Amino acid sequence: MNRRNKTIEYRNRQIYAEYIAHIRNGLPVMDAYAACGNSYDLSEESIRKIVAEQARAGP
């Protein structure tokens, strides 16, 4: 893996960590996505999974 790919991978991990932190702090999924600048490329399946997990966890 070249240096550019490592940098992109590191950045994506940071954005994902921020995204998950927003969700854990109670921010709705799509608001959390917007708060991260829509930078992290999430598939619809991933969003559905996160929404389901959030619903199970409750408020």
Pin down the residues of each PLM region:
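Short, amphipathic alpha-helical "recognition" segments used to contact nucleic acids or chromatin
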Residues: 8-30
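Major-groove recognition helix of helix-turn-helix-like DNA-binding domains
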Residues: 42-59
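Intrinsic disorder
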Residues: 6-9, 41
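Secondary-structure boundary motif
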Residues: 21-25, 38, 56
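Short, Lys/Arg-enriched N-terminal segment that forms or immediately precedes the first helix
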Residues: 1-5
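Short alpha-helical "recognition helix" segments of helix-turn-helix
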Residues: 32-39
